[in-house]
Amino acid sequence: MSHEIESVNGRASMVFAGETPWHGLGHRLQGDESADQIREMAGLDWNVQVEPLYRKIDGEFVEFPLANASVRDMDNTNLGCVGPRWTPYQNESMFECFRPMVENGLMKWHTAGSLRNGQRVWCLCELNLENSEITPGDEIRKFAMLSNGHDGKLAVHFGFTPIRVVCANLSL
């Protein structure tokens, strides 16, 4: 499996703190960026719109009521086919979920990005807690991750993980 990091205009849609990921893609965080700056650096400064789908019947286009298209607003990229009750969880909301905890010193921004041409997105924060060791030299780090599928195939997911998520191989 490849990393599946999205590239828009030759620019990887990912940010990271600390060590450069194995794939060498993304933009290094300095540690003082705001949530909005990180969202922009990660190429996640766009929204998802829900648009109707149509089918051709007897030469005329008729709205198809059982599904809609999820579409990225900045470039009209089709992200998926979703049900009529599906509501997008915007990238900005993902960062807003973590913002109060980062601002209060409970965690710090670590990685964020877009996979599969914008269909999947994630944001990872490292908790400001002491790392654990199961055995000497085997350090366990503590992260919180929020991931989301704009393609209608993955619900919003929040969880804790000891894994530094930097690509599709480790997440979603």
Enumerate the language-model features and the residues they cover:
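Intrinsic disorder/low-complexity polar-acidic segments
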Residues: 93-172
